[in-house]
Amino acid sequence: MSRRGVIQRRPVPPDSVYNSRLVSMIIRRIMRHGKKSLAARIVYDALKTIEERTGNNALEVFERAVRNATPLVEVKARRVGGATYQVPMEVRTERGTTLALRWLVQFSRSRPGRTMASRLANELLDAANESGNAIRKREETHRMAEANKAFAHYRY
């Protein structure tokens, strides 16, 4: 086993427009092939669309969407004596946020629509209203954890 210590995670700098770490994180998630300015434009266009459609502060809607899509528990595979059990585990705050952002981006990519900005805006609005694929994924994760509650004592 490695003798090196655990490396500290670098803090995510807030983005320049909204001064928000969450916006910066979703920009990084959307980015492909190092094209960060394109990813930023997609996110800012989506947030502008949200503000025009709802009349509310786009950042608040975005934060509510992330909060609604964040899972509280997940299952992890654990091998015990030749059998693999799905053990329910609590999700740490940082991982929960990361999973929520990952799901929001993943399902906005698979959505029908013309531009990525509009698809992202629709997914965020759905998540803020407790519907959409990201919310369904969170509910499915919670159901899996509930179904495997009997194996909770295998937690590590």
UniProtKB/Swiss-Prot annotation:
Task: Please provide the record's keywords in A-Z order.
Answer: Ribonucleoprotein, Ribosomal protein, RNA-binding, rRNA-binding, tRNA-binding
Q: Which GO terms describe its molecular function?
A: rRNA binding; structural constituent of ribosome; tRNA binding
Gene Ontology BP, a term: translation
> What CDD domains does the record point to?
uS7_Chloroplast
- Residue ranges annotated as coiled coil are none
GO CC field: small ribosomal subunit
* Source organism superkingdom: Bacteria
InterPro entries this protein is in? Answer: Ribosomal_uS7, Ribosomal_uS7_bac/org-type, Ribosomal_uS7_CS, Ribosomal_uS7_dom, Ribosomal_uS7_dom_sf
- Alphabetized HAMAP family for the sequence: Ribosomal_uS7_B
Subunit relationships: Part of the 30S ribosomal subunit. Contacts proteins S9 and S11.
Q: What does this protein do?
A: One of the primary rRNA binding proteins, it binds directly to 16S rRNA where it nucleates assembly of the head domain of the 30S subunit. Is located at the subunit interface close to the decoding center, probably blocks exit of the E-site tRNA.
The record's NCBIfam families line, in alphabetical order, gives: rpsG_bact
Say which family it is in.
Belongs to the universal ribosomal protein uS7 family.
Name assigned to this protein:
Small ribosomal subunit protein uS7
Q: Which organism is it from?
A: Nostoc sp. (strain PCC 7120 / SAG 25.82 / UTEX 2576)
Taxonomy, top ranks, is: Bacteria, Bacillati, Cyanobacteriota, Cyanophyceae, Nostocales
Which gene codes for it? rpsG
